[in-house]
Amino acid sequence: MHRRDFIALMGLGIGGAAVPSIFGKAVAAEQLLGALDVAFKKRLADAALNAATAAGCSYCDVRVGRYLRQFIITRDAHIENVVNTESTGVGIRVLAGGAWGFAATNELTPEGVATAARQAAAIAKANSKSQTSPVQLAPTPGLGEVSWKTPIKKNSMEVPLKEKADLLLDVNAAALAAGANFVNSLLFLVNEQKYFASTDGSYIDQDVHRIWAPLTITAIDKATGKFRTRDGLSAPMGLGFEYLDGDKSQKFVSPNGVVNYGMSYDMKEDAVAAARQAREKLSAPSVKPGKYDLVLDPSHTWLTIHESVGHPLELDRVLGYEANYAGTSFATMDKREARFQYGSPLVNLTADKVAPGSLGGVGYDDEGVKTKKWDLVRDGKLVDYQTIRDQAHIVGKKESDGCCYADSWSSVQFQRMANVSLEAGKSKLSVADMIKDVENGIYIIGDGSFSIDQQRYNAQFGGQLFYEIKQGKITRMLEDVAYQMRTPEFWAGCTAICDQSDYRLGGSFFDGKGQPSQSSAVSHGSSTARFNGINVINTARSLG
């Protein structure tokens, strides 16, 4: 489920009711605290490993997972819903006869887990009868007993519910006082407590935290019935509740005064600004279609990176293994061998699972592989993909990239997108200096609607805020802006990237993939970047 789909459900008033069935059983807030004892989890894991080995499996991994989520949903002066969910169980994956088998159980006893392991073994043996080539697992060292935790300062689950609700209602009141007609604000809080064990000799305990604080402001012209919205400029993050402290050092002010945010977010300040900007959008002139140089803020660029780089460079899409859910990829294996020109020489795109504050940042993936950072595009040329253990041999790698993930103990892990990011420019360059060189352009802030084809080649992107640039100066707000692109042509048009001081993360809290669908969270970083000669359309115009 994509984050925009989730917000749409909230707007219809049905999202809250759907939450428990999607994420687990509804529980009291107090049940979101604490964790299973590590020794208990190890006993369960050993029971599964021993049963799988006794059943003739050549490999087994076990994931003991406790998934905790809290959603607080408000509209104007009202709390519409508070949902706490908890889901705990064990997922067991085995190799037998060169084929995979998987089974899961929520019976947290050694006997229950051993039974599930034997079921997984039986499934693998049945699958092996139709397996055309055996699974080849890239080796990974046994790590012994290790642990990793998101480096948070405040555990969101330990913050009193009243404090969270009061924050949202205070944000809403400030936006309404500033001229908003309607305000929706939410808190999505996640804690994944994951224990991994395998016959390789790893026992990995991880405590992963994520937070997202979206809001939507609506302004209405009562004389005409026209309305405009402005979504919040927060980013979902791999942080604790300290993200909402509003640290002033993490504010990024654009040349025209729009405030963006880095590793800390002032939700109230953003809501007040959004109310003013949503009202300003009501009278903003509509864009004239044509070719423009685009200056794209990181709050916008993350989505373009996600769709035009992150997804097409997932190896399962490249190979055609993943097709039904949002397509395959134009970036086929022959293009990697030929060092295909994915973008201009300024473009360096990396994948990583270790970025501080990122949604995808963990110590180890769901195959027990220690995470890392690696190149996808270097100096504009395609050099690599995102791979997991049973894919590595296909591209000649000796090890996995460490980007395997399952969204639940009851789901089998598979290849998921790492944090894919555009590296900052190497030369000192501010946003103001970048804009000074633009004769005819548009400055875009925030993400909006988008569309992309099944090969991740042709796409269209909107945004939240659009500003005309004429002769090196921001002149006025525009409306009804979207740009069209072909992936390699768009990235070839990248002519400037601001330096590291402007670098920020954006991301998707609910990124869907697979059938049955699984949701993951992933960040994408960049500094403000310029793209020349991009086709802009007017979304308010109709054909005919």
Residue ranges and their predicted role:
Residues 2-544:
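N-terminal small-residue-enriched
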